[in-house]
From Swiss-Prot:
GO terms for cellular component: cytosol. This is Polyribonucleotide nucleotidyltransferase. Its EC number is 2.7.7.8. Belongs to the polyribonucleotide nucleotidyltransferase family. It comes from the Bacteria.
């Protein structure tokens, strides 16, 4: 009989979360089944016993997978089986990875695999907000070294009140949606979108989230005690030579500090200078000695380089490229650079450059979303590409990676609330990073704003973005908040805090922290300093283009929308789509129709106004209600001995009796010169109340001859 160990977390709103271990996946180093309502996630962790020789980083791999069976659904596609990870699953992986990675010991290099699987879902509670807790709990019941526990929660603001882990329905009403990860003591990661909130409101949301996370962390500590996994495995993944470490520091620190303080703005020249110092030190050793000590020298020199850069900033306020801590790199922008797309822009900030294009599409271009729990259509798309040449790397470009999906998602969230809800076009923004030295996702936001305005998209307000950094040594009061960080400042610093927004508030944020003990005072200073930087960048954007263009590019599609009564939808489509397809062939316009809120919504698009006007005329003809006494221009469809049948509205034929053709008596219709295909004006004089047949007259429109 299996006796699983269960820990229950009581939430403030009456809901509960249970963490169960010892029942499933017992051969993993740690496994926990998390349950909230009918949502169940299994998290497992496995770690190699030893590190791969030569590994000097943390080889952590996080996988998140949603089973379609969890929600009682079949996967799509020919194989009817789960395939490669969706963007949503990749983004959830990244949320968990970014929270866990900083908390493994610096000298722990064994491969660690975290797998989180959604086995049951009810469509009410959101599983991505629970994945971090499940993963941390699995680590907590394992013997893998980890300086946790952590947890993640989603906090949303609905009608002015903060809600922890809202339901799908609640989130639709929120004006703030952020994910926060933290240990019991410190916030580690933040990511989310919002409707132009203030810095103080964002900080308040983070504090509310942290209080909820503390409850989760305490429960995991108690679960660890219950399982008896308080002692972690021993490991030795790094061998050190303290004499060599001291020799590297003594020989290289002053030279490295001089490079760090030189203010060279060219990152390749600067790195070459740093590398030359290391190579000079290595030159004193033989090839045999370097085989033994070369990797250690590289690691120790990296520490020297890091210390020199950090001390230069803290002690002198000098950054690697010579800027002050609050200074933004030089910016230049250009719009309309590419003639082919419907809008384009170049945004260059220092050595980071984005070339962004905008394409306007119709309803047929909507992205269909068919994930396990998310269904619908996306009308605003943003794609981010980061080719190797942007950093001068000589390597092949593979498919879209997790990083590109994550950076694109952040820029998408920064801009999407600025697109009017009733905007008729489907919009695709593509950012190609051509140069990169930090903050490329923020360059995408700025270039995206410029390109959207160049395309004539009526965005509500321009958006700018900035990446902030932090230098803070443990045990020191002194710290430095850096505006518009370089790639090296991101790598060697303690924080990467990206903030985007308009002149009136923040629209999106993403923060990763690598140090303990980061106070809310420091976060507040970083947010306020970010606001100053955002306003400066926004000014540069508005100098280039101050508002959206009033006219679309000549080759952009034109779109008109109209609504019709629900009962006419079938008439517009026709049997097997015959009518709507015929109208498209006749006019050259693209016509789509759907039922929304009990009415038919029609979208007509084309490359010229005439095709759209012709399509509108035909549709109006179909949905028009024939009125007795109205005059119509009709087409003679057939000739009979007793008269002619005339199509006076699309799909509506009436009888023009021979006696109604002319005032004089006719023996045949042809006597009046009427033949099939002729267009003639007729008046609707009657509708048979029983059969609904239409009676037409031509003679009432002709002058009546005087009686002799």
């Amino acid at each position: 009989m299996i006796n699983p160990i269960v820990k229950t977390i009581e939430l403030g709103d009456g809901r509960t979360i249970t963490l169960e271990t010892g029942k499933l996946a017992k051969q993993a180093d740690g496994s926990v089944m998390l349950r909230m309502g009918n949502t169940m996630l299994l998290a497992t962790v496995c770690a190699a016993k030893d590190a791969v020789p030569g590994t000097d980083f943390m080889p952590l791999q996080v996988e998140y997978k949603e089973k379609f069976a969890a929600f009682g659904r079949f996967p799509g596609g020919f194989t009817k089986r789960e395939g490669r990870a969706s963007d949503y699953e990749i983004l959830t992986c990244r949320l968990v990875d970014r929270a866990l990675r900083p908390l493994f010991p610096d000298n722990y290099h064994a491969e660690v695999y975290v797998n989180i699987i959604l086995f049951s879902a009810d469509g009410v509670d959101m599983p991505d907000a629970l994945a971090g807790l499940a993963a941390s709990a699995a680590l907590a019941v394992s013997d893998i070294p980890f300086n946790g526990p952590i947890s993640e929660v989603r906090v949303a603001r609905i009608d002015g009140k903060f809600v922890i882990n809202p339901t799908f329905d609640q989130l639709e009403q929120a004006d703030m949606d952020i994910m926060v990860a933290a240990t019991y003591e410190n916030i580690m990661m933040v990511e989310g979108e919002m409707s132009e909130v203030s810095e103080a409101e964002l900080l308040e949301a983070m504090k509310v989230a942290h209080e909820a996370i503390k409850v989760h962390c305490k429960a995991q500590m108690e679960l660890t005690e219950m399982v008896g996994k308080t002692v972690k495995r021993e490991y030795c993944h790094e061998e050190n030579d303290e004499e060599l470490r001291k020799a590297v520091h003594d020989a290289c620190y002053d030279k490295s500090y001089a490079i760090a303080a030189s203010g060279n703005r060219n990152k390749h020249e600067r790195q070459d200078a740093f590398d030359a110092i290391r190579d000079e030190f290595k030159a004193q050793f033989s090839e045999e000695e370097l085989e033994e000590k070369g990797a250690l020298i590289d690691r120790y020199y990296h520490d020297v380089e890091k210390e020199a850069m950090r001390r230069c900033i803290l002690d002198e306020g000098k950054r690697l490229d010579g800027r002050k801590t609050t200074e933004i790199r030089p910016i230049w922008c250009e719009v309309g650079y590419l003639p082919g797309p419907h809008g384009s822009a170049i945004f260059t900030r220092g050595e980071t450059q984005s070339l962004t294009s905008v394409t306007l599409g119709t309803k047929l271009d909507e992205k269909i979303i068919d994930d396990v729990l998310a269904h619908g259509k996306e009308r605003f798309l943003l794609h981010y590409n980061f080719p190797p040449f942007s950093t001068g790397e000589a390597k092949a470009q593979r498919g879209v990676g997790r990083r590109e999906i994550g950076h694109g998602n952040l820029a998408h969230r920064a801009l999407k609330r600025m697109i009017p809800e009733d905007y008729p076009y489907v919009v695709r923004v593509v950012s190609d990073i051509l140069e990169s030295n930090g903050s490329s996702s923020m360059a995408t936001v700025c270039a995206g704003t410029l390109a959207l305005m160049d395309a004539g998209v009526k965005i509500k307000k321009p958006v700018s973005g900035i990446a902030m950094g932090l230098i803070k040594n443990a045990g020191e009061e002194k710290y430095a908040v850096l505006s518009d960080i370089l790639g090296d400042e991101d790598h060697l610093g303690d924080m990467d805090f990206k903030v985007t927004g308009t002149k009136d508030g923040i629209t999106a944020t993403q923060m990763d922290i690598k140090v303990d003990g980061l106070s809310y005072e420091i976060l507040e200073r970083a947010l306020n300093q970010a606001k100053e930087g955002r306003m400066h960048i926004l000014g540069k954007i508005e100098e280039t283009i101050s508002e959206p263009r009033t006219e679309l590019k000549d080759h952009a599609p034109r779109i008109e929308t109209m609504t019709i009564p629900k009962e006419f939808i079938g008439a517009v489509i026709g049997p097997g789509g015959k009518i709507i397809q015929g109208m498209q062939e006749e006019t050259g316009a693209t016509i789509t129709i759907e039922e929304i809120d009990n009415v038919g919504r029609i979208e007509i698009s084309g490359t010229n106004k005439k095709s759209i006007d012709d399509a509108i005329r035909l549709i109006k003809g179909i949905v028009a209600v024939p009125e007795v006494g109205e005059v119509y221009k009709g087409k003679v469809r057939s000739i009979m001995p007793y008269g002619a049948f005339v199509e006076f509205l699309p799909g509506k034929d009436g009888l023009l009796h021979i006696s109604e053709i002319d005032w004089k008596r006719l023996e045949t219709v042809e006597e009046a010169g009427i033949k099939e295909g002729d267009e003639i004006e007729v008046k609707l004089i009657d509708i048979d109340p029983k059969t609904g047949k239409f009676k037409l007259s031509r003679k009432v429109l002709l002058p009546r001859p005087e009686k002799k």
